[in-house]
Amino acid sequence: MDDATVLRKKGYIVGINLGKGSYAKVKSAYSERLKFNVAVKIIDRKKTPTDFVERFLPREMDILATVNHGSIIKTYEIFETSDGRIYIIMELGVQGDLLEFIKCQGALHEDVARKMFRQLSSAVKYCHDLDIVHRDLKCENLLLDKDFNIKLSDFGFSKRCLRDSNGRIILSKTFCGSAAYAAPEVLQSIPYQPKVYDIWSLGVILYIMVCGSMPYDDSDIRKMLRIQKEHRVDFPRSKNLTCECKDLIYRMLQPDVSQRLHIDEILSHSWLQPPKPKATSSASFKREGEGKYRAECKLDTKTGLRPDHRPDHKLGAKTQHRLLVVPENENRMEDRLAETSRAKDHHISGAEVGKAST
C-alpha cells in the first residue's frame, strides 16, 4: 500500500512533497479531522540504519509526544504500518524556515529579532525545564507560522538528560549537530553538558538574525575552532547593533562552559526585556580590526589581537553545514570528524548517524 493510500485511510489527503532526507521524506496533507493542512514525515524502518532506529528515532518520538509549547511545532498524531513505515503528523510551517526568510529579507531589525528570539528561548527553557535538550538548534530547524512566529522543529538529535545519584546531569558523549552551530567542546569531542551546548547554538542563531551572516566561517574547522576558543566575535559595523544585543550574543558564544549563560539568564537579559523609549547607542564602542570591539558599556568582553578572518560570512544559497555525529570513543575532532555535507530540508529529522551513547 503506498503512502497516499495509507494516509487517505487515516483521513489525510496528500498534497505536495516538502522535502526528502536520507531516511525520511515530508509531504503536505490536508487533515479532514483538523480541517487544515499539516506536514507528514514518513520514515521507513527498513531503509534506516540500526543505530538511528534503535536510539535516535525512539527518543524523537517520545519527546514529540511529550512537548506542548506554543513555540514548538505541534505533533498531532504518530502511527506505524505493519511493514515498518512511521508517519508523524505535524504542524505545517507555512512561511518556511528562518534561514530562508533571512536570506530573502536580510538581517532582522532588533525589535523583530527580539520577538522571535524570545519565542525561541521560551521554547528552549520549556525543554530544559523538562530535562530535554535539542542538540541541533539552527535556523533551518526554526519554522515560521502564518504570522511569522517561531516554531522549533526537528527533534532528531534530542534526548532526555540523565542524572547521577547526586542529581547532576551526566555529560553527553554523542557529538552531534551542525558544525556551524556546534560549540567548541563538541567540535573537540569533549564530553559536554548538553543544555550548555544548546546555549551556544542560540548565540549563533541570534547573530544570524541581527547580522544576516554567520559568526564564523565553517569552511576551515580548525581555524574556526581556534577563533572560537579565543572568544572572538566580530559584528558588522554597518548593522549598528545595540550594546545589549552584542553583549547577549557575546555571553552565549562563551567558550568557557562555566561562564556561558544559562537559559534563565538569557530570558532575563536586558536586551530581551521590552525596549525602553531611548535605546542604548552603540556609538560608545571602540572597534578594532575587522569589526571586533572593545566594550565601554560594562560588557563582559576582552580585547584581543586583530582578527585574521573577515566578518560577514555569507549565508549560502543552500545550507550545507556539516552534520556531526561522532562515536563515543573518538578522541579529538580535528582529525576524526565524521563530516557529511548535505542540504538538510528544514522538516527532515536527523540523519547520517553513527554509533553513540548519550
UniProtKB/Swiss-Prot annotation:
GO MF term list: ATP binding; magnesium ion binding; protein serine kinase activity; protein serine/threonine kinase activity; protein-containing complex binding
Keyword Phosphoprotein in annotation: yes
Compartments in which it is found: Cytoplasm; Cytoplasm, Cytoskeleton, Microtubule organizing center, Centrosome, Centriole
Cofactor section: Mg(2+)
InterPro entries from the UniProt entry: Kinase-like_dom_sf, Prot_kinase_dom, Protein_kinase_ATP_BS, Ser/Thr_kinase_AS
Lineage: superkingdom: Eukaryota
Single GO cellular component term: cytoplasm
Annotated ATP binding sites: 18-26, 41
Keyword Cytoplasm: yes
A Pfam family it matches: Pkinase
Single GO biological process annotation from the record: spermatid development
Record comment: activity regulation: Activated by phosphorylation on Thr-174, potentially by autophosphorylation.
Enzyme active site: 136 (proton acceptor)
S-S bridge residues: none
Region Disordered, annotated ranges: 302-358
Basic and acidic residues biased stretches: 302-315, 329-349
Keywords in alphabetical order: ATP-binding, Cytoplasm, Cytoskeleton, Developmental protein, Differentiation, Kinase, Magnesium, Metal-binding, Nucleotide-binding, Phosphoprotein, Serine/threonine-protein kinase, Spermatogenesis, Transferase, Ubl conjugation
Gene3D superfamilies associated with the record: Transferase(Phosphotransferase) domain 1
Post-translational modifications: Autophosphorylated.
Tissue note: Testis-specific. Present in mature spermatozoa (at protein level).
Chemical reaction(s) catalysed: L-seryl-[protein] + ATP = O-phospho-L-seryl-[protein] + ADP + H(+); L-threonyl-[protein] + ATP = O-phospho-L-threonyl-[protein] + ADP + H(+)
Subunit and interaction comment: Interacts with TSSK1B. Interacts with HSP90; this interaction stabilizes TSSK2.
Further comment: TSSK1B might be used as a target for male contraception or and intra-vaginal spermicides.
Family membership: Belongs to the protein kinase superfamily. CAMK Ser/Thr protein kinase family.
Name of the protein: Testis-specific serine/threonine-protein kinase 2
Gene name as annotated: TSSK2
